Amino acid sequence: MQVTDVRIRKITNEGRMKAIVSVTFDNCFVVHDIKIIEGQNGLFIAMPSRKTPEGEFKDIAHPINQETRDMVQKAVIEKYEAVISAGE
């Protein structure tokens, strides 16, 4: 599986959330509402989630292994940094 497209849908400079993105896999499956968050150790992605009646947040869709999570995160952050650099 490959990341074939990353679209930065919204960029904000306020707070820890920096952007909302959509990621396409193999030109045939898209996941919307992935967030780019600024943490203590740099940028990371948060997968789309919903709040349960108990107040917990559960991912709607997410990678099931670290290798895939790293691949998606790398593609998303590289695209975000390219868009930010182009805008400066």
From Swiss-Prot:
Question: Domain of life here?
Answer: Bacteria
Keyword annotations for this protein, in alphabetical order, are: Cell cycle, Cell division, Septation
Mention any Pfam family matching this sequence. SpoVG
| BP GO annotations | division septum assembly; sporulation resulting in formation of a cellular spore
**Protein task:** Could be involved in septation.
Q: Which family does it belong to?
A: Belongs to the SpoVG family.
Q: What is this protein called?
A: Putative septation protein SpoVG
State the species of origin: Caldicellulosiruptor bescii (strain ATCC BAA-1888 / DSM 6725 / KCTC 15123 / Z-1320)
Q: Report which gene this protein is encoded by.
A: spoVG
